[in-house]
């Protein structure tokens, strides 16, 4: 395919037009009085959202240079969303301000590389200031306030705080659509996975269709169990101990399954067989998680363990196991606390090293099952459009709350960024690097000014007033009052603010140092063939 090339000023201006087109659509959503954006979908109802990254993803521009500019800013929003779960609109507003100021200076003759170095040093200084001024999140109320700001709804904030209180900071909080109105919170104690009993004959509570085992032994096998002679020696030992047995294996079939079922029906011996969750390496890892949680070992030929030689010391234990047709919950496994902590640390390390979103999500689920628990927030609404929008807001707020717990909070509303600007004078930079730092200084005002503008106030006046207030005091855009924002519950997670600034600066540096853009030439539409043109003039 033929390419089209643009150089220096023309190239940079083309990219900037694309950036502005996208940023102007996104920035109207910033702040408590920000508006929504309607996104048309090819199929189904349109989506209404105020989430920066969702809006950015939908924007496709026709001009090849503008398209590349917009794609670069999408990257800012997406990266911020991946790292912090929120702050995508702030990142976009910062990127636009940095690029606008930067290109003005490049056009005036400044050296782009000098500007880039100045921007990087200034961002490093601001990040340091943010982390130094962060306040740890200690109370349920602080978590609720932070989540409520992200979701724009206090009831959502309260529910997320309650969920985090129950499952711990490492716990997984998932959001599901509900057929009823309002919000509901469901909690799972212990480790739950999505596999139920292999046979309905294992049920101990016919009314609830559940198999409940109190204080059972837990046998974990990495292969299929099909012959009784392999299982018999171990079964006799378990029966002798007078306890029920949960078998988790790749599969339990044939005479092994029928023996377990017959003994259950006769009342001789209570047991339940369940298939192990996952596939391949993930199944092995999850079985190992269960072994550590319950204090047992996985019976696997890879490590030289076989069923016929197994004894009770290789079995795990738990206070209670509940198995339904779809899922199994292990409550209070008897595993060693240090071993569990070691496994948690190992999974955390794997999450940090993984560059696949899917793998990270699965590892996060495993981590939650070991370290915390699982909470499900069920959201309902009158229409499908409202339901999708609400679910999206709650998911963002959950990630926002987790980010707050991780690195602490600072005053929200764009105030912390603006009030961090004076610290840049300490850098003592010269020449184009000083100009680069000044670009950051100007850009730090952009989020606050945009929040003020979206609230119907004069941005310049608000920025000047906030600049002269004590640290942490600023405009509460929801009420229009100038006050101590942390005390008023207007807070942003440091991780969100920091990521927004770092990602915006990264893309701005690329914009400023661009000297040429190579893009695909737009294809001209081929003229359509007139009707009957290929028929040799024949009539039909």
Swiss-Prot record:
List of residues binding ATP: 29-32, 86-90, 413, 492
Descriptive protein name: Chaperonin GroEL 2
SUPFAM superfamilies named in the record: GroEL apical domain-like (SSF52029), GroEL equatorial domain-like (SSF48592)
Function: Together with its co-chaperonin GroES, plays an essential role in assisting protein folding. The GroEL-GroES system forms a nano-cage that allows encapsulation of the non-native substrate proteins and provides a physical environment optimized to promote and accelerate protein folding. Prevents aggregation of substrate proteins and promotes their refolding. In vitro, activity may be independent of the presence or absence of the GroES co-chaperonin or ATP. Shows weak ATPase activity. Mediates association of bacteria with macrophages. Acts as an adhesin that binds CD43 on the host macrophage surface. The full-length protein elicits robust pro-inflammatory responses from dendritic cells (DCs) and promotes DC maturation and antigen presentation to T-cells. DCs exposed to full-length GroEL2 induce strong antigen-specific gamma interferon (IFN-gamma), interleukin-2 (IL-2), and IL-17A cytokine responses from CD4(+) T-cells.
EC annotation from Swiss-Prot or TrEMBL: 5.6.1.7
Keyword entries, A-Z: ATP-binding, Cell wall, Chaperone, Host mitochondrion, Isomerase, Isopeptide bond, Nucleotide-binding, Secreted, Ubl conjugation, Virulence
Recorded phenotype for the gene knockout or disruption: Essential, it cannot be deleted.
Catalytic activity: ATP + H2O + a folded polypeptide = ADP + phosphate + an unfolded polypeptide
PANTHER family cross-referenced by the UniProt entry: 60 KDA HEAT SHOCK PROTEIN, MITOCHONDRIAL (PTHR45633)
Top class in the EC scheme: isomerase
PTM comment, free text: Cleaved by the mycobacterial serine protease Hip1. Hip1-dependent cleavage of multimeric GroEL2 results in release of cleaved monomeric GroEL2 into the extracellular milieu.
Free-text note regarding domains: Each subunit is composed of an apical domain, an intermediate domain and an equatorial domain. The two hinges that connect the equatorial and intermediate domains (EI hinge) and the apical and intermediate domains (AI hinge) play a significant role in the chaperonin activity. The N-terminus is important in determining the oligomerization status.
Note: M.tuberculosis contains two copies of the groEL gene, groEL1 and groEL2. GroEL2 is probably the housekeeping chaperonin, with the GroEL1 proteins having evolved, following an ancestral gene duplication event, to take on a more specialized role or roles.
Site (Cleavage by Hip1): 13-14
Gene it is expressed from: groEL2
Species: Mycobacterium tuberculosis (strain ATCC 25618 / H37Rv)
Disordered: annotated span: 521-540
GO biological process annotation, one example: chaperone-mediated protein folding
InterPro entries assigned to the protein according to its UniProt record, in alphabetical order: Chaperonin_Cpn60_CS (IPR018370), Cpn60/GroEL (IPR001844), Cpn60/GroEL/TCP-1 (IPR002423), GroEL-like_apical_dom_sf (IPR027409), GROEL-like_equatorial_sf (IPR027413), TCP-1-like_intermed_sf (IPR027410)
Similarity comment: Belongs to the chaperonin (HSP60) family.
Assembly notes: Forms a cylinder of 14 subunits composed of two heptameric rings stacked back-to-back. Also exists as lower oligomers, including monomeric, dimeric, tetrameric and heptameric forms. Forms monomers under standard conditions but oligomerizes in the presence of high concentrations of ammonium salts and either ATP or ADP. Interacts with the co-chaperonin GroES. Interacts with the serine protease Hip1. Interacts with host CD43.
Phylogenetic classification of the source organism: Bacteria, Bacillati, Actinomycetota, Actinomycetes, Mycobacteriales
NCBIfam families per UniProt: GroEL, PRK00013.1, PRK12849.1, PRK12850.1, PRK12851.1
Pfam families documented for this protein: Cpn60_TCP1 (PF00118)
